């Protein structure tokens, strides 16, 4: 986001712009903590969301809040089902609820282990700890 502020010399603008940038960062961090798509956008900035991603995100948020105990997603291949459900959702969920446990399962052990490693690597990353510092 870029703004143009006209309030005099650079000395006066610099602290205001710094404060504005800090407020934007804090708002983005809060959105990433509280919404699944906010988290996706923070850890995967080049991701381009479609309408089906927003629907999945809302469903995942309901599951995380305990409003929905079961969820089945039927979608064509290559629509980010696995990236969302097996990688990004567990990462976001563990950040929100660090006392909970996740079971990683798939049709092959190799795939489940691979997603588990991706989750572990993301949770240990610098960009993740900026969202969930604890």
Q: What are these model-derived regions, one by one?
A:
Residues 2-134:
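Phosphate/NTP-binding elements of NTP-utilizing enzymes
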């Amino acid at each position: 986001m870029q703004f143009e502020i006209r309030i005099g010399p650079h000395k006066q603008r610099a602290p205001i712009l710094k404060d504005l940038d800090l407020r934007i960062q804090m708002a983005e961090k809060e959105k990433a903590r509280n919404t699944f798509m906010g988290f996706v956008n923070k850890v995967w900035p080049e991701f381009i969301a479609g309408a089906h991603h927003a629907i999945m995100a809302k469903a995942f948020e309901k599951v995380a809040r305990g409003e929905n105990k079961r969820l089945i997603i039927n979608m064509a291949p290559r629509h980010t089902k696995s990236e969302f459900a097996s990688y990004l959702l567990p990462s976001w969920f563990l950040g929100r609820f660090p006392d909970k446990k996740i079971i990683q399962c798939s049709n092959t052990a190799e795939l489940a282990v691979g997603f588990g490693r991706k989750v572990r690597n993301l949770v240990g990353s610098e960009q993740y700890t900026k969202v969930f510092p604890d």
